Swiss-Prot record:
This is Phosphoheptose isomerase. One of its GO terms (cellular component) is cytosol. It comes from Salmonella typhimurium (strain LT2 / SGSC1412 / ATCC 700720). It is found in: Cytoplasm. Zn(2+) binds at H61, E65, Q172, H180.
């Protein structure tokens, strides 16, 4: 009944991954991002992560597997997803939704910390403002984007971009793979 649809969806997902893998710059960017994050942790820094909708869930997933665990038991790493509902509702009400992440970065971000900003379009105003706030604090910035990188293109120390111009879910599928690989590489870097 739906077998053709299922095959088409899985084939499109595989094609998106294959296109991402064709560009060696993506592989190098993932490696550089993992080293940057591990170096921050080793120096006493932390990572703040943010995004909207599914990207917000990815930001929380990233932080959870750093503070909790991924595949093996090991010490937790300092990671915070900007996801506190009382903070988000307060800032949305008092300043506007575009400031929900930047106000948090201003409050807890420090030089030597890292911001991971996630946006499938690269055009999320609140993530863009968080990047600006991170820069003001002397933080490093890693972005996970899609399409052509949108307004976030060129704003990060390291951008990992999924060059897919279709639906956002295909970009998110690659983002979660990248997140898992980042965690795996961070774990290896932390025991060096």
């Amino acid at each position: 009944m739906y077998q053709d649809l299922i095959r088409n969806e899985l084939n499109e997902a595989a094609e998106t991954l294959a296109n991402f893998l064709k560009d060696d710059a993506n592989i190098h960017a993932i490696q550089r991002a993992a080293v940057l994050l591990a170096d921050s942790f080793k120096a006493g820094g932390k990572v703040l992560s943010c995004g909207n909708g599914g990207s917000h869930c990815d930001a929380m997933h990233f932080a959870e597997e750093l503070t909790g665990r991924y595949r093996e038991n090991r010490p937790g790493y300092p990671a915070i997803a900007i996801s506190d509902v009382s903070h988000i509702s307060c800032v949305s009400n008092d300043f506007g939704y575009d400031y929900i992440f930047s106000r948090y970065v201003e409050a807890v971000g420090r030089e030597g910390d890292v911001l991971l900003g996630i946006s499938t379009s690269g055009n999320s105003g609140n993530v863009i403002k968080a990047i600006a706030a991170a820069r003001e604090k002397g933080m490093k910035v890693i972005t996970l984007t899609g399409k052509d990188g949108g307004k976030m293109a060129g704003t990060a120390d390291i951008e990992i971009r999924v060059p897919h111009f279709g639906y956002a879910d295909r970009i998110q599928e690659i983002h979660i793979k990248v997140i898992h690989i980042l965690i795996q590489l961070i774990e290896k870097e932390m025991v060096k």
